[in-house]
C-alpha cells in the first residue's frame, strides 16, 4: 500500500506540497488547473504551455462556511476560501482553522483523504492560516 495524491495531475506530494499549473510561453499567463486545450488569454495552442510548479501559499480573498454538502466527505461544516496563490492564479480550497478571514495568509498542507479500492491512502491539499 502506498500514499498517493487524490489528483496526481494537479499536486506533487512534497514538503511543502507543490501545485501543478502551467504558463503560456506566448503571453506568460499562469493558470491552474492546467488547461489541455490552450491558453484562455491569448488563444495559443496547448503546445505553447509549459508545466509550472506553484507554491501552495497565498492570500484569502473570500470565505464561506459550508453547512450542507451532497457528499459524505468532507464532513460539514467546513470552510472554503478563494485564494490568490503567490504564483498568480486564483483557486478555491478548503481552509482549516478558526482565524480564516479575508486577507489571511495561508499555506498548503497535505491531509489524509480516503482509501482507494486497492487500499492505497489518498491525500489531498487543504490550506491553513500561517501563524
PLM feature segments, named:
Residues 58-60, 95:
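Conserved hydrophobic positions within beta-strands
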Residues 75-90:
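Short, basic/aromatic beta-hairpin or loop at an interaction surface
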Residues 90-96:
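Short alpha-helix capping/helix-loop boundary micro-motifs
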Residues 1-19, 101, 124-131:
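A broadly conserved sequence feature marking short terminus-proximal activation segments
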Amino acid at each position: 500500500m502506498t500514499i498517493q495524491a487524490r489528483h496526481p495531475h494537479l499536486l506533487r506530494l512534497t514538503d511543502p506540497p507543490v501545485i501543478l499549473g502551467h504558463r503560456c510561453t506566448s503571453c506568460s499567463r499562469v493558470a491552474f488547473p492546467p488547461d489541455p486545450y490552450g491558453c484562455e488569454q491569448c488563444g495559443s495552442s496547448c503546445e505553447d504551455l509549459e508545466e509550472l510548479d506553484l507554491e501552495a501559499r497565498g492570500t484569502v480573498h473570500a470565505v464561506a462556511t459550508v453547512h450542507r454538502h451532497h457528499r459524505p466527505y468532507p464532513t460539514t461544516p467546513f470552510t472554503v476560501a478563494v485564494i490568490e496563490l503567490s504564483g498568480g492564479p486564483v483557486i478555491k480550497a478548503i481552509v482549516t482553522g478558526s482565524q480564516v478571514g479575508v486577507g489571511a495568509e495561508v499555506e498548503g498542507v497535505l491531509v489524509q483523504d480516503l482509501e482507494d479500492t486497492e487500499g492505497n491512502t489518498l491525500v489531498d491539499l487543504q490550506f491553513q492560516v500561517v501563524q
